[in-house]
């Protein structure tokens, strides 16, 4: 992207609505409640031939530096310093407030280009607020309606005028396309070849867990900066925020998510939106780290989150956070491992790593567990090896007999990876008990070293060409 733009303004003037309009997706949560956005969120904006990086920010308010609102303000000011240009959004419908005046003064002191945007200009009675915006001393306001998409051409022209045509439209260079991602090995390929794991591709990782488990603190420690809001208050994170960083030469894209509580406790509409956003992050990720509070682990909600991640087909890693607060670490670790095996039988062999997001202890081991788990999630096994294995499994533990006739497993192949899924051709597939399926899944985990990822097996009976036809008498 050629330049970076920060959207700033007081709460509830329509910043996130404008952000979603510019990126062409509903990435940021939008609600009538003031202060929905808390962290700064970057995105790729496209505006009538103009491309740039856009940053959505929290509403600016006067607040004590140590308060939640004060920490939100610090995040927004960091976005302003990072950006080349600020879109200062005011509400033309409700008019100016003293906060708008203070923000205008703060932006002037920064000395960077500012485009004054009068949002909600389609509303009846907005003319007064539009003309009042001139008094801020930031030039002519650009009237728009972020909700309805009106005034976007004028907004583009104002951005180009503020940033300069050379920055807005840099000369395009002929660049060979080398980063097109066409994943073939995950769903198709030579059945007799087992593809080599590609450790150069960016890895998408979602960080999930109960409120106040330390998810944002963990990501900040990875990044080495206070990129995300943290604090003692539960439920600080609302949007799923993505950040990128490099680990041993590999790009990692991490998604911080809102804390997930039990459904019965989720009453507010805004929290429901936040949880839905977290679910989307899980589905978009490749590997999901479920963060447990090691001081109070294995709450019912922890187990439900793990089950949800596995049902979505994601690779899963457990992180027992706040390890710096544990005294008898050896005894606690042994207890946690015993409970993991007992309470999460569907995740047999799942990698569990004790960490401290506060001090950074154990984070290298956690990252290695994430990479190792992703390798398993992408694993493919040749058809020849699978059928030799299937024959051995049936010798050791034959399938049960149904109505006096034993079920025969004839052929096995892997139909996809991410997560690994297999198809077995057999007789009477509808009569095969669940216990035998579990036996095969556990065998695959043990014999092909496939812990911590969901494994799917589909059984199929060959079509009977004579089914439905009358027998001759």
From Swiss-Prot:
GO terms for biological process: ribosome biogenesis. InterPro entries: G_ENGA (IPR031166), GTP-bd (IPR006073), GTPase_Der (IPR016484), KH_dom-like (IPR032859), KH_dom-like_a/b (IPR015946), P-loop_NTPase (IPR027417), Small_GTP-bd (IPR005225). Pfam families: KH_dom-like, MMR_HSR1. Coiled coil: none annotated. CDD domains: EngA1, EngA2. SUPFAM superfamilies: P-loop containing nucleoside triphosphate hydrolases. GTP 1 binds at residues 9-16, 56-60, 119-122. Gene3D superfamilies: 3.30.300.20, P-loop containing nucleotide triphosphate hydrolases (3.40.50.300). Residues 3-167, 203-378 form the EngA-type G domain. Residues 379-463 form the KH-like domain. GTP 2 binds at residues 209-216, 256-260, 321-324. Keywords: GTP-binding, Nucleotide-binding, Repeat, Ribosome biogenesis. GTPase that plays an essential role in the late steps of ribosome biogenesis. Belongs to the TRAFAC class TrmE-Era-EngA-EngB-Septin-like GTPase superfamily. EngA (Der) GTPase family. Associates with the 50S ribosomal subunit. PANTHER family: GTPASE DER. This is GTPase Der.
